[in-house]
Amino acid sequence: MMGGNISHEFMLLTPVGEDSIAICTECDYRANMEAAECLIHNEKNADTQELVLVHTPNIHTIEDVCEFLHCEKKTSCKAVVYQRNSDDHYIVLFIRGDLEVNETKLTNYLGYDIHPAIITEESGLHAGYIGPVNLRGDFTVLYDRSLEGMNNLSCGANVCEYHYTGLDMRRDIEGAEYHDFAKIQEGGICPHCGKPAITVSRGIEVGNIFQLGTKYTKSMNMTYIDANGEAQYPVMGCYGIGIGRLAASICEAHHDDYGPIWPLAVAPWQVHLCAVRADDTKVQEYADKLYEELQNKGVEVIYDDRRVRAGVMFSDADLIGVPFRVIVSPRNIKQNIVEIVSRDKSLSVNVSMASAAEEILKTLSAAK
C-alpha cells in the first residue's frame, strides 16, 4: 500500500496475470492475496498429551518431521525466520505447518522491511529445530492465529536433532498474542460468508484507489485553515489507471491464435486497407482513391500497399488486429467489388467499388 489502511484494486482475471486473487464462489468477496484475511477454524483435541522431547536425527524440514513423527502438517508448529533490513534483527514467526506466511501482512504489522533470515551460529537459533518452548534470545517472536488454542502439536525443541510432541499452546506458551500472518489457500474459509469456498485466480491490476488519509500531509506538516480558523491536515486520495496495463488486458481478453482483436472503441485504426498486388496500376489507383475518400470522411485507416504476397499482408494484418479489413485486389477489381472482413471473422461481405466508402461507414456505425 502507498499509505493508509484502505485500498481498492481493479483487476482483470486472466491466467497470465501477475497477481493472485482470492475469490469466493459463494458470495461477492474478492481480495488480492496480499491482503486477503485467512480465517482458521482451530480444532483442539479433547485429550491433551504431555510435552515429550523426541530425538529426531538429521530431520530439518517440516515434511521430514511429519514423516518421522507420523503426523500431519496441520498438527505441527513450524518456525519461519526473517531479519530486519536495517540491522538484521531476527523475527521468528510460528505458524501451523500446512500454511504459508503472507510476507505483506507481516511487513505491514511490523512497520519495517524484512528479508528471509540467514541463520548463523552466533544467533542462538538452530535451523530446522526452532520452537516456541524455551526459545531464548533477543528475537521478535510472533504467532499466527492458526495456532491459537491448539494442542498436541509437534515443534522444534531449540536443540539440534530434537523436537517436541504434545505442545499445548495455552499450557506451554505464556503471554502469546496471535495475529493473521497466513496466506489464504484454495478451499479456505471466506471472511465474508464463512463458507470454505475460496478459489485462487491470477489477475492483472488495471487500476487502483488508495485512501491515503493524512499520512503524508502530517509527515510534511501540510495544513489549511478551516472555516473556524483552525489548522487542519488535508485528506488525500490516490487514483491510478494503468494505461499500458489496460492495453495488455484488452489484448488478453480479445485475441485469437493469430494476434489481438481490438474492440472498435480502443483500436488504433478502424480500417486496415490492404492493396493486394499494388504493382497493378488499377489496384493502386483505386486503393489510393478509397484511402483518401475514407480519410476525408473521418475514418482512421492504416494503408498497406507493400509489394508483398497476400498471405504475408493478411498475416501482418492479423498481428495488428484492426477491427475491419478492406481488401482491394486484381480479382476484386475485375468483379467490381471490394471485400470487407472483420478481424473476429464474424463478417465477410463483398460490396460494390462505387459504394465501398459508404458501405464501410455503415459497417463501422453498426459495430459501435
Kindly give the residue locations of the regions a language model identified:
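NTP/phosphate- and nucleic-acid-binding module
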Residues: 1-368
